[in-house]
Amino acid sequence: LDYQDAVVVSDTSFTLYNDSAKELAQRQHSFSSPVLRTDGSLAVVYHQEGTGIRIESASETLTSRNLEQKIISASVSSSGVYAALTQSKNYLGELTVYLSDDTEKYKYYFSEWYPVDISLSADGTWGAVTGIAAQDGTVKSVVYIFDFNQEEPKAKFEFSDNLLLSIRCLESGNVAAIGNRGASIMIPAAQEKIDYDYQGKTLSTFQLDPYYGMVLALAQSEDGRNCTVVRIDNQGKTAMEYPVARKVTSIGYNNGVAGILSSGRIYTYSDLGEETGAYDAGNDAKKILLYSNSQAYVLGVSEIRQVFFS
């Protein structure tokens, strides 16, 4: 996959488009509840709560198989290594890591936390897993950091009263996690984490990126209006933070430009919080993805469109 390609999965097929909207590939699958995740040149498509999993490149399906247990989450690396979190007969869940030839590289059984999500590093040598557990009426979350050449996790970070929603391994070697009450950058080498508390604001939308870290839209109220836009870089530094007097339904960031989707329009901002443009995205726009600092893909109800920033 090229960084400008658009990849779409429906309930029947995996489809790849180039940046001029030309269809490059369409491959059928049989998953009733497919989930798509990409990393660099590869994509993984798996059957949520099913056993089917596929690894796709731009030119071909590299792997198509059924695992022994139902899949909770999966991730693929640019190197071809892929991993799956699955249910387990005797434990709360299992992590299995596979090499590009489908041979098993690593196995871990979870006995204290229910595994929820996984992210692999670009080279596939390490990864991060989120888990949840209930304690005294509250939900606790955990992040395990794995080196797949070591039997046990090399780091473990616990979170009280913060339900982790998504996780991403970063190019810096750190890990980003987004929760419903706060976000964190974990630094495994130092066994420390840097937390950003939402201070009672509501998480409206977010984006995780292996190079730029995370960008968040935090609303003052549950209706999503009057947001604060925050970017935390891959070292845990708050790189930008500014108010936006709009309801933000999707957000993206690329090379100094933040884009927010609000009421069918994309508004762009500099790192200083200055509005630099407004562009029509269509009334059916649901989500945006900035694939450069001058271009975005827009996901509509029945199509994907491009928007160019002047």
Briefly describe each language-model feature range.
Residues 22-131, 137:
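Non-cytosolic head/periplasmic domains of membrane-anchored proteins
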Residues 9, 46, 84-86, 129-130, ...:
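Residue-level marker for isolated small/hydroxyl-bearing positions within beta-strands
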Residues 108-230:
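Acidic, serine/threonine- and glycine-rich low-complexity intrinsically disordered segments
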Residues 6, 43, 80-83, 124-127, ...:
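Hydrophobic beta-strand positions that form the internal "hydrophobic ladder"
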Residues 1, 29-41, 68-78, 112-122, ...:
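Repeated scaffold domains used in trafficking and secretory/extracellular systems
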Residues 20-28, 59-66, 103-109, 151-158, ...:
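A short beta-strand motif characteristic of beta-propeller blades
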Residues 13-15, 51-55, 90-96, 135-146, ...:
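Structural motif
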Residues 190-281:
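Intrinsically disordered, low-complexity segments enriched in Gly and acidic/Ser/Thr residues
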